[in-house]
Amino acid sequence: MARTKHPAVRKSKAEPKKKLQFERSPRPSKAQRAGGGTGTSATTRSAAGTSASGTPRQQTKQRKPHRFRPGTVALREIRKFQKTTELLIPFAPFSRLVREITDFYSKDVSRWTLEALLALQEAAEYHLVDIFEVSNLCAIHAKRVTIMQKDMQLARRIGGRRPW
């Protein structure tokens, strides 16, 4: 028996979507609130479709902002950050964190030189980048593209790092 092509069957037409009305606000205006009116007077009805001079309003089409496809901006940012050499963690919050940690563990050490803080920040960022690289490899090995907590835990276990 020969195969035949069956045309697509259309269902009944769906109701048209409700259009949003940006000209009128659902909230009552100041004049309506002050006068206690219900908003059904002739002045409010005629003002909805006309401007202050009495001419009908023309609707202006607003262009949608351009959106890139998912992942395009992420890849662009990856390339940008791979090219740069500056530190990505802001210095002030990092130095506050270092001072907070040193206050917690040692009351003797209270002052840090700028070079010591910069060296510590450089090492911390390198460590984070290394962890993320190995975690990404673990996620790819699991046939995923999203890094999960278990990837980071596995990366730390395999790398021989301490559990803290």
UniProtKB/Swiss-Prot annotation:
Pfam families in the record: Histone (PF00125)
Modified residues annotated as N6-acetyllysine in this record: K19
N6-methyllysine PTM sites in chain numbering: K5, K19, K30
InterPro entries found in the cross-reference section: Histone-fold, Histone_H2A/H2B/H3, Histone_H3/CENP-A
Residue ranges with Basic residues bias: 1-11, 60-69
Domain of life, per lineage: Eukaryota
Gene Ontology molecular function terms on file: DNA binding; protein heterodimerization activity; structural constituent of chromatin
Chief place where the protein resides: nucleus
Biased composition regions of type Basic and acidic residues, renumbered to the chain: 12-26
Keywords from the named record: Acetylation, Centromere, Chromosome, DNA-binding, Kinetochore, Methylation, Nucleosome core
Region span, Disordered: 1-71
One Gene Ontology term, aspect cellular component: nucleosome
Modification sites for N6,N6-dimethyllysine: K5, K30
Annotated Low complexity bias: 40-55
Modified sites of kind N6,N6,N6-trimethyllysine: K5, K30
Protein family according to the UniProt entry: Belongs to the histone H3 family.
Function, as annotated: Histone H3-like variant which exclusively replaces conventional H3 in the nucleosome core of centromeric chromatin at the inner plate of the kinetochore. Required for recruitment and assembly of kinetochore proteins, mitotic progression and chromosome segregation.
Protein name: Histone H3-like centromeric protein CENH3
Organism: Oryza sativa subsp. japonica (Rice)
